[in-house]
Amino acid sequence: MSDSDTRKALNRAIGYLGIREHSRQEIRGKLKRNGFSDETIEKVLERLDTLNLLDDLSFARNFIRSRTRVKPSGLYKLRYELRQKGVPDDIAEEALREYDSAAQCLNAALKKMPFLKGDQEHRRKKLHTHLVNRGFDSQTIRQTLDELLTN
C-alpha cells in the first residue's frame, strides 16, 4: 500500500461525500468494491474523521429527515434501513429519539386516504395494510385509524 493509493482512496471517498452524506460503512464498502486494501480504507476513514467529514449520527438524522419528507415511514422501517446503511444500532436509536411516529403515521395515512375506495371498513383495512408496510407499529396505526375513520 502506498501513499498514492491512500490519496486516491481519500479523493474517491471525498467525491462520494460530495454527492451526498454517507455512513462510515457505506464508504468502507464503496472503497472495498473499488479494490482498495483494508489498511488503506482504515487510513482513509481515520482521515475523514479528523476532517469531520464522516459522522454516522449526522448521516442518520439527515437520512431520517429526508426519508420521512418523501415517504413517511415508521420506526421499524427506518431502523431497518439505517441498519442496511451500516449505521450502528446505538447511533440509530439516538437519531430516532427525535422522530415523531404518530405524526408521521398520520401524515402517511392522510397521503393515502384520497386514493382509497369502498366503504369505511374496506378503507380501514387498506389503510392498515399500507401503514404496516411503511413500518409503523400496531398501536400507532390503531390510534391513527381511530382518529381518521371514527364517525
UniProtKB/Swiss-Prot annotation:
Q: Where in the cell is it found?
A: Cytoplasm
**Cross-referenced Pfam families, in alphabetical order?**
RecX_HTH1, RecX_HTH2
Q: Where is the signal peptide?
A: none
One GO cellular component term noted in the UniProt record for this chain: cytoplasm
UniProt-recorded name of the protein = Regulatory protein RecX
Source organism of this protein record: Prosthecochloris aestuarii (strain DSM 271 / SK 413)
Say what the protein does. Modulates RecA activity.
Which Gene3D superfamilies does the UniProt record give?
Answer: Winged helix-like DNA-binding domain superfamily/Winged helix DNA-binding domain (1.10.10.10)
Gene name for this UniProt entry: recX
Disulphide bridges:
none
What domain of life?
Answer: Bacteria
